[in-house]
Amino acid sequence: MIVDILSLFPGYFKGPFDESILKRAQEKGLLTIRLTDIRDFADNRFHRVDDRPYGGGPGMVMMPQPVTMAIQHVKTPEAKVIYLSPQGRTLNAVKCRQLALEKHLILLCGHYEGIDQRVLDEEVDEEISIGDYVLTNGCLAAIVLLDAFSRFIPGVLGHPSAAAEDSFEGGLLDYPHYTRPEVFQGCSVPNVLLSGNHQEIAKWRHEQALKKTQEIRPDLLA
């Protein structure tokens, strides 16, 4: 998959994409991440990309010209353009699975008060929010989105069933996990996990996942 990220701060992404799972996914050719600076497409000598909003109000709005040019520069016929925005539909595991099937995604990061609506109307296919809160810019949201859906790309995770057993898969939160030592500060690993009985272990894990979901996220069971 190819992922183009358009923002005003491409250097923001260097660390997260150069470590751990996302780094290995790129090295294996499963994921290609390209960064584009929207300022490079400004048609003025000061590379200005924002201006005051019509109608008044606080803050600045990203102008349509540089954003549109940046999108069109990387866009292909099969590309899907996503704008990271608190006004978008809230991201969930189902959406992550859907995005993992795409061949080319363009992630548009907003800054200031947002982007001129004409760009969203003409160039953007979908707006996605990572939660009901506001960040200083869309870069963090793009990192979260990319990390979340990339886990569903075949081969990205070490074990093929790893993503299938995570929280929200099957409509439940994840079950508790334990590793060595068997006893730590007086707390022991549940006996069922030491039994070797895979049927009982699976039953216990489902019960624990259901219990945690009922306590913390009962809305998932509604």
From Swiss-Prot:
The gene is trmD. It comes from Protochlamydia amoebophila (strain UWE25). This is tRNA (guanine-N(1)-)-methyltransferase. Keywords: Cytoplasm, Methyltransferase, S-adenosyl-L-methionine, Transferase, tRNA processing. SUPFAM superfamilies: alpha/beta knot. Homodimer. GO terms for biological process: tRNA N1-guanine methylation. InterPro entries: Alpha/beta_knot_MTases, tRNA_m1G_MeTrfase_C_sf, tRNA_m1G_MeTrfase_TrmD, tRNA_m1G_MTases_N, tRNA_MeTrfase_TRMD/TRM10. Its EC number is 2.1.1.228.
